[in-house]
Amino acid sequence: MNDTKDNKVYSSARHSKYWQKLKAAAESKWSLAALFAQDNTRTQRFSAQSGALYMDYSKQCLDDTVLESLLNLANSCELSARIQALLQGAMVNTSEERAALHTALRLPTTANLQLDNQDVVADVHQSLGQVERLSERVRSGTWRGFSGKAITDVVNIGVGGSDLGPLMATTALDEWADTCVEVHFVSNMDGTQLDNLLKHLNPETTLFIISSKSFGTIDTLSNAKTALSWLLATAKLRAGTEDSVLRRHFIGISANSEKMSAWGIHPEHQLQLWEWVGGRFSLWSAIGLAIAIRIGMSGFKELLAGAHSMDEHFAQADFAENLPVLLGLIAVWNSTFLQVNAHTVLPYDGRLSYLPSYLTQLEMESNGKSVTQHGDRIDYDTCPILWGEIGSNAQHAFYQLLHQGTQQVSCDFIACVRRYSDKAKNTPLQQQHELSLANCLAQSRVLAFGNAAIAETDSQIACDADKYKYYRGNQPSTTLLIDELTPHSLGALIALYEHKVYVMASIWDINPFDQWGVEMGKQMAESVHDAMQQEGNAPFDTSTNQLLKHIKQLS
């Protein structure tokens, strides 16, 4: 279906009677301890499952009446129609007049989707075929560097969505790696990452992937330029040419083939993106080449299949059982109505170490907006500040604030039920995994119930008169349990959060697919950089001018 010209104006949740009901409900003094005491079926009713993902949201500060109002709020803004518009290629990115078809990147070959008279599914699978061919050449050792040696290391140069997604996924799925080719990631513009990495790599056996949708991102291109210089310095000593270095040591991934060619990427090593793929939603595309190299194309296809299964759940499940809808509505309830303006993601699994950073970009860059799609200034809270860390590490870092600070913070606990199943039972590794699961459940319990959670097991601590030992509880949280971390379940988990973002944006009536807030800083950086190269006074504010003067004096 081609619906890009559909400029439908949807009903606004802001003007719904359910918005006012939720505002009134938010004035109540919510007590999680009381909610659980009043209803022994609460957990069964306030939980849902899709495939390998089980979600318990019973520790959120809401009841049946609030949940019903949230579901009605979703209907009031025509969320079902908005979901179909997203999936069918409507112009949901209104400011840039584009579709946002990241879900098309994981459609099976049997699907049918047309956009501007172009067969999207055929184009996607043609690109996946190219990803498979290039990745297998690297994995099999048939891709050779300028000196004829097989590639041993691949460096993905990108930033934002061109870095965080592949980095997060390859780290999470590293135990599925079935190749001796190592994959590395470089994003920092100051060169520190790249400089430290190159000291340990062999120029003759290193392949670089330059990932940039525009192929104009200064962070990425400055690192790519340094990488090329490093390669050429060695190639000249080995009678290699610049052409052989560019042909054998660089792959480009971008929506701008002209810029790739101008930089020197050979056409057969260019992978195309589409304008309807946003950077933070792009790991399913050719941007995922590094993932395919590391875990193989079969694993990458399983990642796509897992995401597609969540797409189908999102499109078909009743809202009351729909994980992305529920997760998004709860986030709106917390941020907009309860004014819980901080949210933390706490995976109790070291393989998910980069998930919090990935979700920080996904949510804050998507929904950190203060203007509606129609240009109206927003008078309600939207996206909360989001951060996170591996749960066991966070316990020794910022859990003190969660338990006894003055800020209310909502939490997502994430854990994998099965791990080390290939080991004999009760091994030290399995014991460690059980300990991690126990900590996950324990922390969510104490955050919810505070001292009341301890009273049942240690009355002395619970009744201690020392106020500095008091746990107030009542911190809202959701717990996501994954049967087992696999490419399929990881794909479903990531898609769950993608769709959560869209649900929130639909309620808030904002565009989650642009990021105009990052543009002015880039433009100003160019002006500041020019001023660094010039003599005399800079034309900025006194603070910036003084800082520039100090830098010049020390340079």
UniProtKB/Swiss-Prot annotation:
Keyword Isomerase: yes
Spans traversing the lipid bilayer: none
Annotated catalysed reactions: alpha-D-glucose 6-phosphate = beta-D-fructose 6-phosphate
Localisation: Cytoplasm
Official protein name in the record: Glucose-6-phosphate isomerase
A GO term for molecular function: glucose-6-phosphate isomerase activity
Main location: cytoplasm
Family as reported in the entry's similarity comment: Belongs to the GPI family.
Pathway where this protein functions: Carbohydrate biosynthesis; gluconeogenesis; Carbohydrate degradation; glycolysis; D-glyceraldehyde 3-phosphate and glycerone phosphate from D-glucose: step 2/4
EC number: 5.3.1.9
NCBIfam families (alphabetical): PRK00179.1 (NF001211)
Keywords noted in UniProt: Cytoplasm, Gluconeogenesis, Glycolysis, Isomerase
EC primary class: isomerase
CDD domains noted in UniProt: SIS_PGI_1 (cd05015), SIS_PGI_2 (cd05016)
An individual GO BP term: glycolytic process
InterPro entries recorded: G6P_Isomerase, G6P_Isomerase_C, Phosphoglucose_isomerase_CS, SIS_dom_sf, SIS_PGI_1, SIS_PGI_2
Active site feature: E365, H396, K522
Role of this protein: Catalyzes the reversible isomerization of glucose-6-phosphate to fructose-6-phosphate.
This protein's GO CC annotations: cytosol
Highest taxon of source: Bacteria
